[in-house]
Amino acid sequence: LFVAIVHALRPKRVGILAPSFSGYAWAAQTVGAEICSIPLREENNFAMDMAQMESLCRQLDGIGLLFLANPANPVGNKMEASLLETLLDVCEKRRITVVLDECFIAFTGTEGYVSWIRKYPHLIVVRAYTKIYAIPGIRLGYLLAQKDICEKIAHQLPEWNVSVVAQRIGMDILNDSLPGWSRRKYLKDTIELIQEEKEFLKHELTKIFGNQMTIFPSEADFLLLKTQIPLYRLLLERGILIRNCANYTGLGQDFYRIAVKGHPENVQLIEALLDIKKKGEEKRYGKH
């Protein structure tokens, strides 16, 4: 959908906060757009504040499209409504299209900003079933925007852009009359599970590594970590794959993202980290 959006609107310059999902830049590059990377401050947990908002507004000259995320990937923080409203007001006056990626919004238990498309004609909200319903192999998502924008984007998609399998799974997800299935209960249980397991991981990681590791606040189903310990290699040796965030603009080799999974998988991760610490292997590679 991000590629279709960019092809439909053909912006000459695209604004992207850093760090953020690499798919935004990839989409912009498909039409040869200039990418304006707007760095967020680590000391503010890579979150937007009023000072950052004012700085961002000063960098909007020439930008035709701005990518935002709520919550953001790979950090997991949400955008405050007052700050987003201020930014959207500025973008609306300048006729800048804002793409708000809410693919992880369901994990927060909040409604997000879909209703704002009525107020802001240049706002596009993108969402996905893939994340919250744990169907990564089924590429199924959607966007909401003003009718004229939706029509432009639809013309950039293949005529048959959703497979029969994806259609069927999507229909079943929305069908609360299926025996043994309640979408509302599933969402409630999933949000509670992720929240409990996230707190478990944060507690255990702090207990193991203390000030050797920074854990950034997250409202999504993942945690961004910063440590000089080469976690990626040490965990890979134990059959556990985490996200090395070295290739994210605005991050570096000390950053990693871990998924918040079910309790058995999270315990397996913690046990592997305890083993690394016990054997002193965090020093084996030195600083990466």
For each predicted feature, which ranges?
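Conserved beta-loop-alpha segment that forms the PLP phosphate-binding cup at the N-terminus of a helix
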Residues: 1-12, 141
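PLP-dependent aminotransferase-like
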Residues: 7-68
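PLP-dependent aminotransferase class I/II
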Residues: 23-25, 122-207, 215
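Helix C-cap/helix->beta junction micro-motif
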Residues: 31, 93-94, 120
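Active-site phosphate-binding strand-loop segment of PLP-dependent enzymes
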Residues: 44-106
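Conserved PLP-binding active-site segment of the aspartate aminotransferase-like
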Residues: 145, 224-227, 238-277, 285-288
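Conserved PLP-binding catalytic core of the aspartate aminotransferase-like
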Residues: 195, 199, 206-239
